[in-house]
């Protein structure tokens, strides 16, 4: 190995030695370090253009952008256009917003350009960073989608950044839930489109239910940038986006099933640590008997029959509602309505409902009015939707713990972007023996900080925990109030969503005390001194030590702890965080804790090992679940893609009668294979019935004789010829264009209907596969095999139904 002693003495000048050391360090640097070094060099080249771009007039700046646009559309690579484009966007930001991108933001944008997850800490300016890579990809004219965490932030970011884009000639669109198709189409036609992930996904689903290509609103999936990527791509990866249709009122049924399940005792079901529930043999017997008594199960039927799958499914959903979902943790009841609570952020999610009849089961449990059950017409998970983009990138404050997941599921690297100013926040944690001791420590920490005017944020993992801490504060002389003041605290949780922006805006003021559920995804920085800016208040908050973040429990994932801590110490501000947890907390259940001698918290190193083990176990389990989801989802995705391609081909086919003829011939072949195989006995009676039912033809069918193969060929040709003649007559009578338009619409409607049914079958199959006692490595192959069989059935049903509709045209019903 080369070492410094091998360099000739005459060559050992300081400059040569430094160059040698630099080359050596670059060789041994990590890939992350080498990447950042490369990005920093590019950032320096962008900054070197500062004088040149500052000298340009607004018109000249716009002309430079137009020139880059022409080069991109003529085939120039985006890599080649990066430096001049970033320099122009940086200057546009300076002129319109009064702030130019700093080096770290340029580095973050370069990571995004390369299709990575940029990990940028709270307050580092992700919104401004996004404009660089959005403008670069917009040059090609294919559209850029920026997915914000919620509607408020999407609208805020679009309006805030719009002047930058406008100066350079880029149009900005905004997708919101209430706008109509014309407005959506116009928004997607813009160079850069802001919105929330769910709206992008739902528009994709709606587009693939349209009957004409010019009715669609999206124009492709070139580049997507996902803000708070961990929430959308990791936490919500398996959340289905669904378009639903009504099934009708079934309130009495849900109440009857809930009453039966409510009567079960612990011997009737088993719960495991993964929050799964299963009926025991005694449970099946009890349910079977109760369903018969209620008249919901026929006397000669069984819960294990195929015909009873749907009924058993409703029973299991009622059992899950009763045993797994807890009020004020998973949902709240507000105004006689069950409202889901985001498990990570504590936000209420009004309008979002659990699917597959689980929400109706909850409404029955809580004796709320039961919403109409819907049938899913089309659905897609966030994971599947965002993997459709040619290029995907994301931004988040915490990605380091999911590096492998981003890589395996999305093919994305994670790049940790250095902060603009050094982090000086101090972090600590204490693990107490009981929850009461932990709450007492939280109170003592709060009292000490409040005495010197330090702003305090207390983070809790759930609404129930938030209420518990609030009760403790009130019992000790604190007053819950919207107004800030001595010994007053504001509450920010899913029950007070409307006050969220105002509460957060003032959480950094001196003496402010804010009690909140999990803060991840709130989307608003906590600025020392509060908002609007007040220099004196900021100095007072800084002098008191900056924001103090107190956690009352550790979250199941380290990333969530980091997000809460990250509220303090933004952009080099002073700050401190401490977690006062206890071995009674939900995270540590099932993890035996060593008994500590005496009073006081556990020894720090022991506590850290215990918490790390519990969090790593939860994270590994969650990762395994999401990885399994991605593999099962990939099977469904391939079927969806095949249907989408077939649907587009039908929708855009100028001569659909050729496809109808092919489907008719395939249908006749199906019937012959089933009822008149060339090497086996014929079932003439059922063949005749099928020909009459599907083809609406009366074709004399004789016994095949000795040469079945020849007879089968002849019969198939004869049936085909008669069917062709019939259709030719219909085309002549109605007109090729008219009959083609009718059958095109028939085929599209049939595909949509069959895919709706297929989606339900596949979801039921996923659950059934999971309940089977199979080795883990056999679950996916089993699902693939049975899903393929279901897809073949769908294809067969499609060609038979199309043929039947075509042959019935003009016949009396």
From Swiss-Prot:
Cellular compartment(s): Cell inner membrane; Cytoplasm
EC number: 7.4.2.8
GO molecular function, one term: protein-exporting ATPase activity
Binding residues annotated for ATP, in chain numbering: 105, 123-127, 525
Pfam family of the protein (one): SecA_DEAD
Keywords: ATP-binding, Cell inner membrane, Cell membrane, Cytoplasm, Membrane, Nucleotide-binding, Protein transport, Translocase, Translocation, Transport
Family of this protein: Belongs to the SecA family.
Official protein name in the record: Protein translocase subunit SecA 2
Source organism: Rhodopseudomonas palustris (strain BisA53)
Gene name of the record: secA2
């Amino acid at each position: 190995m080369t070492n410094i002693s091998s360099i000739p003495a005459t060559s050992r000048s300081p400059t040569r030695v430094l160059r040698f050391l630099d080359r050596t360090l670059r060789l041994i640097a990590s890939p992350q370090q080498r990447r950042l070094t490369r990005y920093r060099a590019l950032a320096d080249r962008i900054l070197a253009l500062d004088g040149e771009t500052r000298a340009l007039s607004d018109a000249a700046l716009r002309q430079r952008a137009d020139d880059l646009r022409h080069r991109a559309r003529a085939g120039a690579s985006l890599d080649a256009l990066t430096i001049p484009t970033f320099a122009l966007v940086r200057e546009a930001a300076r002129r319109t917003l009064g702030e130019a991108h700093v080096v770290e933001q340029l580095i973050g944008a370069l990571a995004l350009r390369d299709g990575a997850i940029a990990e940028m800490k709270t307050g580092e300016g992700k919104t401004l960073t996004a404009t660089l890579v959005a403008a670069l990809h917009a040059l090609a004219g294919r559209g850029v989608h920026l997915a914000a965490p919620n509607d408020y932030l999407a609208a805020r970011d679009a309006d805030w950044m719009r002047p930058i884009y406008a100066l350079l000639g880029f149009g900005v669109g905004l997708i919101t839930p209430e706008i109509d198709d014309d407005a959506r189409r116009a928004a997607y036609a813009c160079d850069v489109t802001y919105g929330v992930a769910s709206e992008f996904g739902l528009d994709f689903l709606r587009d693939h239910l349209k009957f004409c290509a010019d009715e669609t609103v999206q124009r492709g999936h070139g580049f997507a940038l996902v803000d708070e990527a961990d929430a959308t791509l990791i936490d919500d990866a398996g959340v289905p986006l669904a378009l639903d249709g009504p099934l009708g009122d079934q309130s009495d049924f849900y109440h009857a099933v809930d009453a039966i399940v409510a009567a079960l005792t612990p011997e009737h079901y088993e719960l495991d640590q993964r929050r799964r529930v299963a009926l025991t043999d005694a449970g099946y017997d009890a349910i079977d008997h109760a369903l018969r008594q209620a008249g919901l199960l026929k006397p000669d039927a069984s819960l294990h029959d195929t015909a009873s799958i749907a009924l058993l499914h409703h029973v299991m959903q009622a059992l899950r509602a009763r045993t797994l979902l807890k009020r004020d943790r998973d949902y709240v009841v507000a105004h006689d309505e069950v409202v889901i609570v985001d498990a990570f952020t504590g936000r209420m999610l009004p309008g979002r409902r659990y699917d597959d009849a689980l929400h109706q089961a909850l409404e029955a449990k809580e004796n709320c009015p039961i919403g109409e059950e819907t049938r899913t017409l089309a659905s897609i998970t966030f994971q599947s939707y965002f993997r459709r983009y040619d290029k995907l990138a994301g931004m988040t404050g915490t990605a380091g713990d999911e590096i492998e997941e981003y890589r395996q599921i999305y093919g994305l690297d994670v790049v940790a972007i250095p902060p603009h100013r050094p982090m000086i926040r101090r972090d600590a944690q204490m693990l107490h023996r009981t929850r009461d001791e932990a709450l007492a420590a939280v109170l003592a920490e709060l009292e000490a900080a409040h005495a010197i005017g330090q702003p305090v944020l207390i983070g809790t993992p759930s609404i129930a925990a938030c209420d518990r801490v609030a009760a403790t504060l009130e019992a000790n002389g604190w007053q819950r109030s919207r107004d800030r003041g001595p010994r007053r605290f504001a509450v920010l949780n899913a029950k007070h969503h409307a006050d969220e922006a105002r509460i957060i805006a003032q959480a950094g003021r001196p003496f402010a005390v804010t009690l909140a559920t999990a803060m991840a995804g709130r989307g608003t920085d906590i600025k020392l001194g509060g908002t609007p800016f007040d220099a004196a208040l900021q100095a007072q908050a800084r002098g008191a030590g900056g924001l103090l973040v107190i956690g009352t429990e550790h979250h199941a994932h380290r990333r969530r702890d980091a997000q809460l801590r990250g509220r303090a110490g933004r952009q080099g501000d002073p700050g401190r965080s401490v977690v006062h947890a206890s071995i009674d907390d939900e995270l540590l259940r099932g993890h035996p804790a060593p008994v500590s001698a005496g009073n006081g918290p556990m020894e720090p190193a022991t506590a850290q090992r215990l918490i790390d083990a519990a969090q790593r176990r939860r994270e590994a389990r969650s990762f395994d679940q999401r990885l399994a989801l991605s593999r099962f989802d990939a099977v469904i995705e391939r079927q969806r893609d095949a249907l989408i391609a077939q649907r587009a081909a039908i929708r855009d086919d100028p001569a659909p009668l050729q496809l109808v003829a092919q489907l008719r011939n395939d249908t006749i072949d199906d019937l012959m294979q089933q009822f008149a195989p060339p090497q086996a006995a014929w079932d003439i009676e059922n063949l005749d019935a099928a020909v009459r039912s599907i083809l609406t033809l009366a074709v004399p069918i004789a016994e095949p004789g000795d040469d079945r193969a020849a007879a089968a060929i002849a019969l198939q040709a004869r049936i085909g010829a008669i069917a062709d003649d019939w259709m030719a007559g219909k085309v002549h009578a109605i007109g090729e264009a008219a009959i083609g338009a009718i059958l095109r619409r028939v085929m599209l409607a049939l595909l949509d209907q069959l895919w709706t049914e297929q989606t339900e079958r596949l979801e039921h199959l996923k659950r059934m596969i999971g309940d089977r006692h199979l080795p883990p490595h056999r679950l996916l192959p089993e699902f693939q095999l049975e899903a393929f069989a279901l897809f073949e059935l769908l294809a067969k049903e499609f060609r038979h139904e199309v043929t039947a509709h075509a042959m019935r045209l003009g016949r009396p019903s």
